[in-house]
């Protein structure tokens, strides 16, 4: 049996139809696993999210509106269909199992064992692909905010000495993207071999594996010590926050020799830099590492030069020189930036379940050869229950009505 081809049509259009014909059942909550489904849906897959009637544990997660509608939920679940079942009852669990078997692709963060174990689901569907997001490899729970602590980043973040958590659930988001990638890799393998299987993706492995890929493990094992706390400075190159004369705090990062030369010229620091180079016997022209190593001499020089200029003046000079910079601003500032949001083609209007109208993000990637469609809204809980049970399980209308009356199936 191959991947289940779409038989129904979701409301509206996909952002792109690159995954048209691929259907996925998703039973998940919080960030990582729903993100995998979101990315698949944005590229045209039919993603059917199955939840408890009334919503899962993240259905009212903050931020919420005054009416308690989750803005978080309605953005992480855009472009999906919704089936609501009473998963506390055997009949509801059996319906979910049947949907998974009928579809052939399953993304979840439910535990390895139990009624959604791969072994149980693969009975009668040996080519089933299950992608299971986990906390730790042994099945114990974890969250982004605890895994982040475990791999050491809070002890690198901020100026010290106390650990500093970052507020972006980066490991969740990276895990979700990797889960979507793993799903497509597994379908590619099945297309070549006919074999299904389970992919287990622990959040902790994504985190520590990423640390390793960035050279972090090798660095500390080679040196035998931890990297120093640098605040907002960038490790290994010239990059830091500075404050202008009109009190605008801006981040400046230099990654090429040309940018370095243009930064020096924009701030008229050629002679001062030459003096430091002569005194210390180094050249900063092409060496990121030397600029970082000698930051004790360079930072004060740049602090004074930048503090003597207004931000608008500096920004114009930096833009002319191709220097990478950006002022710090609030998320509300970002939301009101026309270039970033209002005039950005990844955003569009959607009929959101909350009733609140705001720019909705579609696929982040742009495919110039294809027309981008508007983002689709998130579904209401149970909005597609009748449609999916009819089309995917071939249940007659009378049987679906019985299940609804019995409280096994919910409709939105």
Give the location of each predicted region.
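N-terminal helix-loop segment corresponding to the beta1-alpha1 unit
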Residues: 5, 10-195, 312, 380, ...
């Amino acid at each position: 049996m191959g991947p289940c081809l779409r038989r129904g049509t979701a409301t509206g259009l996909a952002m792109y139809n690159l995954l048209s014909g691929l259907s996925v059942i998703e039973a998940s909550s919080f960030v990582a696993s729903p993100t995998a489904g979101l990315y698949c849906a944005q590229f045209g897959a039919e993603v059917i999210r199955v939840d408890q009637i009334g919503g899962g544990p993240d259905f009212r997660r903050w931020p919420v509106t005054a009416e308690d509608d989750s803005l978080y939920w309605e953005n992480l679940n855009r472009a999906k269909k919704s089936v609501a079942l009473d998963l506390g009852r055997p009949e509801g669990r059996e319906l979910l199992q049947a949907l998974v078997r009928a579809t052939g692709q399953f993304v979840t963060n439910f535990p390895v064992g139990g009624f959604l174990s791969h072994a149980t689901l693969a009975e009668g569907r040996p080519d089933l692909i299950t992608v299971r997001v986990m906390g730790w490899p042994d099945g114990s729970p974890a969250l982004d905010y605890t895994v982040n602590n475990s791999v050491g980043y809070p002890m690198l973040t901020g100026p010290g000495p106390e650990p500093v958590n970052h507020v972006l659930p980066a490991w969740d988001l990276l895990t979700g993207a990797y889960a979507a990638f793993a799903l497509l890799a597994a379908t590619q393998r099945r297309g070549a071999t006919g074999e299904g299987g389970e992919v287990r993706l622990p959040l902790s492995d994504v985190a520590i594996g990423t640390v390793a890929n960035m050279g972090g493990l090798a660095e500390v094992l080679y040196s035998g010590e931890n990297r120093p706390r640098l605040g907002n400075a960038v490790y290994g190159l010239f990059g830091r926050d500075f404050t202008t004369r009109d009190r605008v705090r801006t981040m400046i990062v230099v990654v090429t020799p040309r940018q370095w030369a243009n930064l020096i010229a924009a701030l008229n620091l050629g002679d001062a830099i030459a003096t430091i180079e002569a005194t210390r016997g180094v050249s900063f022209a092409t060496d990121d590492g030397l600029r970082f190593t000698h930051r004790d001499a360079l930072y004060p020089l740049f602090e004074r030069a930048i503090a003597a200029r207004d931000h608008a003046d500096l920004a114009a000079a930096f833009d002319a020189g191709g220097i990478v910079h950006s002022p710090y601003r609030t998320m509300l500032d970002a939301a009101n930036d026309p270039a970033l949001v209002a005039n950005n083609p990844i955003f569009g209007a959607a009929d959101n379940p909350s009733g609140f109208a705001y720019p909705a993000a579609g696929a982040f990637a742009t495919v110039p050869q294809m027309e981008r469609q508007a983002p689709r809204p998130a579904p209401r809980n149970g909005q597609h229950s009748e449609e999916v049970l009819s089309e995917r399980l071939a249940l007659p209308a009378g049987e679906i009505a019985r299940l609804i009356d019995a409280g096994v199936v919910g409709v939105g």
